[in-house]
Amino acid sequence: MLPREEKIIRERLGREPNEVEKAMLEVMWSEHVSYKSSRKWLKLLPTKNEHVILGPGEDAGVVKFDESTWIVIGIESHNHPSAVEPYGGAATGIGGIVRDILCMGARPIALLDPIRFGPLEKEKNRYLFEYVVKGIADYGNRIGVPTVGGETEFDESLDNYTLVNVVCVGIMKPEHLVHSYVTKPGLKLVLVGNRTGRDGIHGVTFASEELSENAEEEDRSAVQIPDPFTEKLLIEATLEAVYTGKVKALKDLGGGGLTCAASEMAGKKGLGAVIYADRVPLREPGMTPLEVMISESQERMLFAVEPEDVEELAKIFEKYELEWAVVGEIIEEPRFVVYWKGDKVADLPIELLTNVPTIEWPMKEYKLEEDVETPDIALSKAFDLVWSSPNIVAKRWVWEQYDHEVQGRTVVKPGFDAAVLKINGEYGLAITSDGNPSYCYLNPYHGAMGTVAEVVRNLVSVGAKPLALVDNLNFASPERPEVYWSFVETVKGLADAAKAFDLAYVSGNVSFYNEVVDRPVKPTPVVAGIGKVKLKDIPRGPRDGDVIALIGSTRRELGGSELYRVLGIKGGIAPRVNLEEEKGNALAILNLIENDLVTFVHDVSRGGVAVALAELSAWFNVGVKAKFTSSFKSIDFAFSESHGRYIITLPEDKVEEAKEIAKISIVGRVGGDNFALEVNGEKVEKDIEELSRIYWNYMYDLLEL
């Protein structure tokens, strides 16, 4: 907490806060809980469209799928904990986002894991990678929620660090919606789930500052302990309780623990709460009221219920062998009061906890973009370098550890542009996530716009009409003027792109202070999106003899590209989004799919058309022959990462009809035993078996597993 903030608290309180009050205020005034550096700017994001039932402000967003089905979606980061203790940090990140979905009254049905690490050549980065994935796998598999997609990226700026973002979607009936706030006094507060221990104490304050060199030893106690078996019981018990209609409000105990959950639940509508901290079931002897109030022990939920309904719900909790305790009540006076064995140990105006002043840090614009000339390298050599990049090869090593088919909804599985989950007999939910810190580092505004555009492309590639977005903004310290400027530019880019597509952000998260020993991470906005697709319309894959076509314009845009990364080129111009072209092409793709004119669609993104075509070959074990002519260098064309582009495959007899819908360029054909790419007479030729071996197995080779 800043000295000026301590002064504001003393003035508003009229006295010095005691030890317990100070600890609670430190938690609630932390960046992680209060969003004090970002709240002003987040208001720029669009939060409403025809599909939105409930936007930002609660634990997750709610989107209308149809009259009888709502989708709940949220996104969270667990960056600091995962950098310090990768297994526990990642696992508890999954647990937290699942409870965010659960406390809206929805059953969690799928997870995504956008995760980022330093180069795999270093042992520490391999250790972080291996144990983050293991933490996600063990927790998700044990609670029975499939991890159906995500991203895995490696970047030099993340050396000895990791960005672990997690997305969860849930499904619910409209009548089961539960809010995270109360609207009347007299309700009892019932704490359900795991006992409270000392793990996670000061977790949110630790997540609101940069890591030191010795963080692994110093901050391990701030990382929570995962217990997926209790979480599974908590999921079933919570849903059964919600279905009784007797739950008046519900919060999970995440960052800030009981202090945050109870004060936010009571304070939103101007009410207060009394907490009897000595009634909280404890895991460890000798805990103090301070520790109880700010512990972030996992797998705990706070229910607000009428006094006469406590026993009925208690029977449900006991059926699942979950501990429960009435730990407080909602009062009319807007105060937050804590008792410990009959003594009042804290008494604060509730708005002092929930109404934290915003901070505007100084900003300094930076310019990194400069036009650079790509070195003269043979197309075939450039292809070999890019195709074997850890950012390009299949992440099968990751998703094979996940049970991505549990619950039986997964129609399109990990590895494609978007996953699809069956919602009913006719429709599915498409879900995807994207981020590109290399673009955002060069140009935060245009990089952010590109992130949204790629989410849209990934959704429409499987035939889905986009419904809504969530965002996770991963940045270094906002106290750095360049970082704060890049954050604001990113938010503006996210806002402008979403408005252009008539999309709304229904939930989100901001994670600042992502740096280790004065080494900041690149600006990394991650956007996840959901869409609605007719199951019968999903393109199933190219057929032998199909024509290959390109939709969209290729420009010389290689700044932040995978080609420049493998060549060690830092400059260049980040790709720009032409919103009109992007929207028009997305609508054209949906039209082509609805009219059954295409057999497959793949968006062109990282690695350009060269990689998009090679992926087509590797995914389906088919030959691909494609030929292009361009006014710029062969490798510039092949590896340009211009937005707004798609590779489509279609039967030859559908080409003319397709041309009436979309501006398509015929570039090749599916068939044969080879992958053959030609640009301006330069050729890349690969045996399918060799191409596929690198794509599917190279990650295992890198990890020496």
Curated annotation (Swiss-Prot):
Coiled-coil region(s): none
EC number(s) stated in the UniProt entry for this protein: 6.3.5.3
Biological or metabolic pathway of the protein: Purine metabolism; IMP biosynthesis via de novo pathway; 5-amino-1-(5-phospho-D-ribosyl)imidazole from N(2)-formyl-N(1)-(5-phospho-D-ribosyl)glycinamide: step 1/2
InterPro entries, per database record: PRibForGlyAmidine_synth_PurL (IPR010074), PurL_linker (IPR041609), PurM-like_C_dom (IPR010918), PurM-like_C_sf (IPR036676), PurM-like_N (IPR016188), PurM-like_N_sf (IPR036921)
Residues that hold ATP according to the record: Y35, D471, G508
A GO molecular function held by the record: ATP binding
Subcellular location: Cytoplasm
Broad class of the protein's primary localization: cytoplasm
UniProt binding sites for Mg(2+) 2: D100, D252
Taxonomic superkingdom: Archaea
Active-site residues (renumbered): H32, H78
Catalytic activity: N(2)-formyl-N(1)-(5-phospho-beta-D-ribosyl)glycinamide + L-glutamine + ATP + H2O = 2-formamido-N(1)-(5-O-phospho-beta-D-ribosyl)acetamidine + L-glutamate + ADP + phosphate + H(+)
Annotated residues for binding of substrate: S77, H78, N79, H80, R99, Q224, E296, S297, Q298, S511
Keyword Cytoplasm: yes
Binding site for Mg(2+) 1: E76, N509
UniProt-listed CDD domains: PurL_repeat1 (cd02203), PurL_repeat2 (cd02204)
A cellular-component GO term for this protein: cytoplasm
BP term (GO), one: 'de novo' IMP biosynthetic process
Keywords of the record: ATP-binding, Cytoplasm, Ligase, Magnesium, Metal-binding, Nucleotide-binding, Purine biosynthesis
Alphabetical list of NCBIfam families matching this protein: FGAM_synth_II (TIGR01736), PRK01213.1 (NF002290)
Subunit-structure text: Monomer. Part of the FGAM synthase complex composed of 1 PurL, 1 PurQ and 2 PurS subunits.
Known role: Part of the phosphoribosylformylglycinamidine synthase complex involved in the purines biosynthetic pathway. Catalyzes the ATP-dependent conversion of formylglycinamide ribonucleotide (FGAR) and glutamine to yield formylglycinamidine ribonucleotide (FGAM) and glutamate. The FGAM synthase complex is composed of three subunits. PurQ produces an ammonia molecule by converting glutamine to glutamate. PurL transfers the ammonia molecule to FGAR to form FGAM in an ATP-dependent manner.
Family: Belongs to the FGAMS family.
Protein name, per record: Phosphoribosylformylglycinamidine synthase subunit PurL
GN (gene name): purL
